[in-house]
Amino acid sequence: MRPTPTLAEFLHAPLTTIRQVAPATMVFSSGGSRRKAALANMSAAGEEYARWSHQQLLKCLELFFSHGIKHLFLPMLLPNQFQETTPNYREHIEQWVAWGAASQTMLEYYQEHNWRVRLLDTQYSPILADAAQRLQQPYDHPDQPTLWWFVVRDSEDPWQIIFQAAQKTVFKTRSQAIEAIYGEPIPPAELFVSFGKPQVNHDLLPPLLVGELQCYWTQKPGYTLSEEEFRQILYDFAFLRKTWQVDKTERTQAALAFRQHWERGPILGLGQQLGPFWYPQSTSIESEL
């Protein structure tokens, strides 16, 4: 059994080492891209904003796949976005997604990076159905890293997908149900990286693919995640959270060495308001001891 590397060693390790501990399936749900545009003194409307944000997203995708992710699920449109009344937003979002996911430039980009890409929509849309069809390429192979863009228009839609699959296909196991919905076997997601408030709902998570999900929330808006930050997440995921033991005989006594931490421990999830936004309270106890 290999010794656990230090964080410093992991941050500088070759990609081949990192890929050995990365989960097969991950969900990435960013947010705050309009907030990031405001911080960059840019209008969060129009093509300039869409292209600017899109380039940052692509850097994140390259980061995740280069570190060993095999199936990356990316919620692009969610129910609250279809309910917005922001001028010049709702009427353009489908065109933005179609362009961002399946333009000719993007098809060439995927081929250059050897990615397979799918677009899932919970309801029929001519714009996105056409984009999904364009993503089906003759060179596609199940062994390629796969990007799954998905759109959820109504909070009931994920359930309807399961019910409809059950009506069309006879399945008796979860694995069979997954294959009926997605067209292939996919390992359950073990890593969820999101933004803002630490909350999860079924709109963000692909149906039937929630495994032992380890969750992380960045507070930097937009598609802003550096390689160092993602490696910190993977280090915590792969090493620090692996605390379960078959025999817990001596485990409980180890808590005595950290009595003040357990007796004065913080509540994760408490926050404060920064103008109209939520931001987490500090949870560091070491400075108080």
From Swiss-Prot:
This is (+)-kolavelool synthase. It is an enzyme of class 3 (hydrolase). It catalyses: (+)-kolavenyl diphosphate + H2O = (+)-kolavelool + diphosphate. Keywords: Hydrolase. Its EC number is 3.1.7.12. GO terms for molecular function: hydrolase activity; transferase activity, transferring alkyl or aryl (other than methyl) groups. The keyword Metal-binding does not apply.
